[in-house]
């Protein structure tokens, strides 16, 4: 294979190309988003069958860094990196699990869940962060002055950044909206010794502040406006096809917050088809919480986007009113005739409890995706016989406090406005799904009296 080139170009089409050594990963001309552009002609000198064989062989290899689901596809991520640059915690190659009983409950016969919560820090964000932090290590080794790496976060990005920077021994800073994360999510950057800053604003406010801070003080920005994150995350699409025998599902359902994830998946599926690894691209369904659904509103209004103020939602990573990657996401969805759906808080709660009831440790964001899937099946857009993969973006253990509070009724999840106002809706409130422990005396007759009626 010929040498592989990779560079930055402006997503908006400004003339010029820039190396990946750029510290401020915004277009130098317009200040907008950049894309990572690969030498697809060089990549195409290897056939689709040869790429499949290479990726399959690497999946079984113990030679570092091939056990990483990202770096086993290194030519498609960042071919400039040397082995000594790569910072990996063993991300990727997470399970993809058939869920027939849950699928039947949702109205589809062929449902699969891609368990991104099995990544090192418990979410899909690790796939992008390994690529970004590895590039920072390369730049610092080459003499670039990068004092630290920073991000704004609603939880999972901060966990990934802090862990990968700790592995690389690079200082990290995270800006968090005070009181908007689960206890478990807040614990992660603290325990990785990231400098953690809680601000009295929402995610959008944190994003504006961290971008300004980075540009003024030689700090490298790690949010998904940095396209290196997208390149790592796009390997998830390759994993899905690879784990399904190099077949592409009919639908992929992905939760949407800052919208880097759907952008990455679309890029990965498109490149696989272009290089001949697969013969089609899936249809994409982006799922948003109704309290924070700017992309859904744009979809319902001919893709005309307007920034909103996100309301409170248990799907905290979606509490974003001005997603950084919205223009990229809209372009990707328009290209594949994608769909956007929104779920109310009650629908979210019902969905994640359904996932739990069928054996998943379901986080609220996956609950949003399951609720959106149900609504699109009921609308007739997703057909019962079609194969559907739902991206479970994070592990339910990150939300143990929320789940425990729901079941113990100490602090139930937010209720939708319709539920609060409608007595009939209150009767169907998902709090009826709670499963508190039974407190019983330590006597067999009392235990039998309580349990035997439940076994009939």
Show the residue positions of the predicted features.
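PLP-dependent amino-acid enzyme catalytic core
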Residues: 1-456
């Amino acid at each position: 294979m010929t040498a592989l080139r990779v560079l930055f170009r402006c997503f908006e089409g400004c003339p010029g190309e820039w190396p990946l050594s750029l510290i401020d990963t915004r277009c130098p001309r317009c200040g907008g988003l950049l894309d990572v552009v690969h030498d697809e002609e060089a990549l195409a000198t290897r056939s689709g069958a040869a790429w499949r064989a290479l990726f399959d062989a690497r999946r079984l290899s113990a030679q570092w860094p091939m056990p990483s689901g990202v770096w086993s596809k290194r030519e498609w991520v960042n071919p400039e990196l040397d082995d000594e640059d790569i910072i990996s915690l063993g991300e990727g190659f997470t399970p993809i699990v058939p869920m027939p009983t849950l699928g039947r409950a949702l109205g589809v016969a062929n449902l699969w869940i891609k368990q991104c919560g099995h990544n090192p820090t418990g979410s899909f964000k690790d796939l992008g962060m390994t690529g970004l932090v590895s590039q920072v290590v390369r730049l610092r080794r080459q003499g670039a002055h990068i004092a630290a790496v920073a991000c704004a976060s609603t939880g999972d990005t901060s966990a990934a950044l802090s862990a990968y920077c700790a592995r690389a021994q690079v200082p990290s800073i995270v800006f968090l909206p005070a009181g908007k994360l689960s206890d478990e999510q807040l614990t992660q950057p603290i325990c990785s010794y990231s400098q953690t800053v809680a601000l009295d604003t929402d995610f959008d406010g944190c994003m504006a502040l961290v971008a300004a801070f980075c540009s003024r003080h030689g700090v490298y920005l790690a949010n998904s406006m940095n396209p290196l994150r997208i390149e790592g995350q796009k390997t998830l699409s390759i994993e899905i096809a690879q784990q399904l025998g190099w077949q592409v599902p009919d639908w992929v359902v992905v939760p949407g917050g800052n919208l880097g994830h759907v952008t990455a998946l679309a890029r990965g599926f498109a490149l696989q088809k272009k290089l001949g690894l697969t013969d089609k691209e899936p249809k994409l369904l982006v799922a948003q919480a109704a309290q924070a659904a700017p992309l859904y509103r744009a979809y319902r209004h001919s893709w005309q986007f307007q920034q909103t103020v996100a309301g409170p939602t248990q799907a905290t990573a979606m509490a974003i009113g001005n997603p950084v990657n919205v223009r990229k996401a809209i372009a990707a969805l328009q290209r594949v005739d994608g769909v956007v759906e929104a779920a109310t808080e009650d629908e979210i709660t019902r969905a994640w409890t359904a996932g739990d009831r069928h054996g998943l440790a379901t986080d609220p964001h996956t609950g949003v995706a399951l609720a959106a899937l149900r609504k699109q099946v009921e609308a007739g857009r997703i057909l019962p016989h079609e194969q559907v993969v739902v991206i479970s973006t994070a592990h339910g253990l990150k939300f143990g406090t929320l789940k425990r509070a729901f079941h113990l009724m100490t602090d139930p999840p937010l209720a939708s406005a319709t539920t609060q106002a409608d007595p009939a809706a209150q009767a169907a409130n998902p709090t009826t799904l709670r499963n508190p422990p039974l407190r019983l005396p330590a006597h067999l007759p009392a235990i039998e009296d309580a349990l035997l009626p439940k076994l009939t």
